[in-house]
């Protein structure tokens, strides 16, 4: 199976929508995976209908994981809860803490909110827009909420990997599963814990074939044990991140 993957399309931004509208992507996969930050869920409608018609027509399934930005605009994370799916076309939809079996492959899909340790709490809660743009059960998102969601997502991923009877396993998250894929110029950032959680020990001892991530707006691939860690983020077109980070609309992995 060929799995074409990308993330951080940010269709809520005019420049990004325009870029995608006028640059039709090649079809290189059987399945398309979108690893978060695609559009605002609060609108309850997918923007750029032409793009979704194209995606629906060209892939067996289009699997989307919600990113942190998908909840922006003071959307309440718990409106949908911690486990949900939403298909807005027959074969296109969002999946939060869900497993989708396609042929002999289990796709384990989760935002995987990161873990923020106490020493980082002040810097992250004051330096990350998530805590100003997102609600949780009617109140502004807190670090405790973030960590609670992280633990739920991580427990779900670990349980799903352990229970899988599929021949192949692909994990899809928005947040980074290891600091090995944090860009060198961000390694000393005070808010790194809002982006990556070190799961290397779990990954190396697992039978995960590939892990697709987004969020960081830097595309760094790695291998941990036998697991390929891959990303393909468009990022902010108005900052030319699609150029500086080497976004490849046709990037795929074969499982």
Language-model segments: residues:
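Beta-strand-turn-beta hairpins that frame and shape the catalytic cleft
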Residues: 1-4, 99-109, 168, 223-228
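Active-site neighborhood of phospho(di)ester-bond hydrolases with catalytic His/Asp-centered motifs
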Residues: 5-7, 32-37, 63-68, 93-97, ...
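Active-site environment of divalent metal-dependent phosphoester hydrolases
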Residues: 10-15, 40-43, 69-76, 99-101, ...
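A short helix->loop->beta-strand "cap" motif at the edges of active sites that frequently abuts
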Residues: 57-61, 166-167, 208-209, 226-227
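Binuclear metal-dependent phosphoesterase catalytic core
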Residues: 100-101, 183, 190-209, 217-255
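Active-site-proximal loop/helix segment associated with metal-binding centers of metalloenzymes
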Residues: 108-170, 175-186
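Hydrophobic alpha-helical segments and helix pairs
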Residues: 77-132
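N-terminal active-site segment of His-dependent metallophosphoesterases
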Residues: 1-64, 71-79, 136-140
